[in-house]
Amino acid sequence: MDRPYVSRNNHERARLRALVDRLSDRDLSRPLEAGWTIAAVLAHLAFWDQRILTLIERWEKDGLRSVPRSIDGKDVDWINDSAKALCLALAPREAARLAVNTADAVDRRVEALSEQHVAANAAAGNPISLFRSEHRREHIDEIEHALGPSRAR
């Protein structure tokens, strides 16, 4: 079975790790749009990766036929708004560490999914986003843009 998400996830996880390694504490506290900070955005990434990790763990425990349901797109904004205060409350360096560690854990779990689980997920309309890379890329690009060209890479 073709699993293009594995290499893409690995690539964006490496970008995430490299970004976190070079961010100073001052960088992590830098404000972004809508009241977020760089550290809070990293915590946000950890939150959504942890969601996928939890869904996979429950799915594997409950059996192949218990495919998780998709999240309603209109719920994403209020979930993000609700989680923002928690993301901002984390110590900035802890948020960065959590983002990398959770990305490591979810990518290992996604890569280890059985072919039956991957096929069942696809048949259900991909309620579990195996391409963790897409969300990471969006926010890594956002952070690099905020840092400016001299600090981005």
Task: Write out the residue ranges for each language-model feature.
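Alpha-helical bundle segments that constitute or directly flank the non-heme di-iron/ferroxidase center
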Residues: 1-25, 47, 51-58
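Amphipathic, well-ordered alpha-helical segments in soluble domains
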Residues: 12-19, 48-51, 102-105, 109, ...
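Acidic/histidine-rich alpha-helical segments that form the ligand environment
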Residues: 8, 74-117
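Short, contiguous alpha-helical
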Residues: 7, 31-78, 115-153
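Short, charged helix-helix connector/hinge segments
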Residues: 26-30
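A general structural signal marking secondary-structure boundaries and capping sites
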Residues: 20-23, 63, 103, 110-117, ...
